[in-house]
Amino acid sequence: MSKQVVIVGGGVIGLLTALNLAADVDQVVVCDQGEVGRESSWAGGGIVSPLYPWRYSPAVTALAHWSQDFYPQLGERLFASTGIDPQVHTTGLYWLDLDDETEALAWAAREQRPLSAVDISAAYDAVPVLGPGYRHALSLAGVANL
């Protein structure tokens, strides 16, 4: 008996579900109202880091950490199996002139994340188009994007 699966929704969740099921079933069909992979996941499917992670619950933090550590491996797997480069780029992330900088640094120490205060010139060097007037910067190394 042949195993067939139909997945409704061609966003990041539907496509990853199809990818993982493909090894165990005979046929996977993905249906979407528009072009597969081009709806909301096209814009937001690569965002796995809350913009201000220290402001979120431990559950969101745990999920974000796992996802951030997993995405580079997933990108390599997708490229190897499809030949399509998902363009995972590790760029890091800067926050400028935060009101809750102390809380951010405490969160990073508690969660063992590589967030640190850096001289504002480092942010200006890394992001030359940054407008003038910023005085303080935090940098989180290792943040990737798609």
Model-found features: residue ranges?
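FAD-binding beta-loop-beta segment adjacent to the flavin cofactor pocket
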Residues: V36-G37, D125-L130
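Fold-independent oxyanion-binding glycine-rich loops
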Residues: Q33, L51, G142-V143
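Dinucleotide-binding Rossmann-like beta1-alpha1 core, especially the glycine-rich loop
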Residues: I47-A126
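Conserved redox-cofactor binding core of oxidoreductases
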Residues: G92-T102, V129-L146
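Glycine-rich FAD pyrophosphate-binding loop
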Residues: A22-G44
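Short, flexible turn/loop "capping" segments at secondary-structure junctions
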Residues: W42, Q87-V88, L130-G133
